[in-house]
Amino acid sequence: MSINAGTNGRKGGSGAFVVETSGLTKRFGDRVAVDDVDLHVPRGSAFGYLGPNGAGKTTLIRMLLGLTDASSGTMQVLGRTVPAERARALRRVGAIVEEPRFHGYLTGRENLSVIAAAREPEAHDRIDGALTRVGLSQRADERVKRYSLGMRQRLGVARSLLADPKLLILDEPTNGLDPAGIHEFRDMIRGFVAEGRTVLLSSHLLDEVEKICDQVAIVDRGRVVMQGSVEDLAADGAPTILVATSDDTRALGVLAHHRAVETMSEEPEGIRVTLRCDVEAENAADDIGRRMFEAGLAIRHFERTRASLEERFLEITSRLEEAA
């Protein structure tokens, strides 16, 4: 999918993108961890950087934050070049990289006070609001060594908010959260975006990215293989239909002989049918329904469905493995 760069990043980050990289590469000896990455993170988006563990996601984030040098390529954060303008670029950036670390013998509030002391005076005034925002106001005066991993993740987000960030960079932020915490986290991210902030979220969890993010880059073995809106990337995949009949065993036989059918699988709701990419989906779906009727099958449910981001991701990465 092509990306229209639109307005290029300008000083202060007033352009269309808050993160832009070109040819960004990082090598560790003979191993290429990040391979020629061109990344464009639109302003005001929830952007998922999606890939399996070991795909180079954390390494890219560390380069954006100036924590490790790139081997080659260029990058801009909020319109400023990193690492040359790192301090100014990161002034309005909040980040969690890997597991957030704190002083265990201090309370959550005291840890934030230590961080705020190194920032502008207004940072201290944001502590209470940040703790409330992440759901830790009732536990803020407990020592962090008593916090669960999920609570430390929340405290890490609170720490990020002390900068009143235009950009939040979160590396695997749902680690350690229970299902209720994950649901609250999704709402929190949506709230940040509604306020005009941009969130760059690195994750290997496809389902979470699809539920949280509106933009995504799919990364595999250090390379960005596709990027764009979640809706467009899923829609670019093979069309599918879900059909349930009076006799799904016979229906499988009908589908097996239809030229438009690529794959089919039985699910609790019926038969999931993936159509070939070279057929016109609407005509093929109509013809499948007609064949079912001619075979004497009663159709209980028939629905054209959108491929999930997970299905699209597996389609892309499996194709890359075959080409390797």
Spans of features found by a protein language model:
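ABC transporter nucleotide-binding domain
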Residues: 186-276
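ABC transporter nucleotide-binding domains
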Residues: 15-21, 26-220, 226
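Small/polar loops that bind or transfer phosphate-bearing groups
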Residues: 98, 201, 243-244, 301, ...
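Non-catalytic alpha-helical coupling and interface elements of nucleotide-dependent molecular machines
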Residues: 117-120, 214, 260, 297, ...
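C-terminal coupling/interaction segments
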Residues: 2-9, 279-324
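Residue-level detector of short coil/turn "hinge" positions at structural boundaries
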Residues: 123, 138, 262-263, 299
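Short histidine/acidic/glycine/proline-rich micro-motifs that form metal-
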Residues: 102-103, 276-279
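Residue-level "edge-of-site" marker
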Residues: 144, 268-269, 305
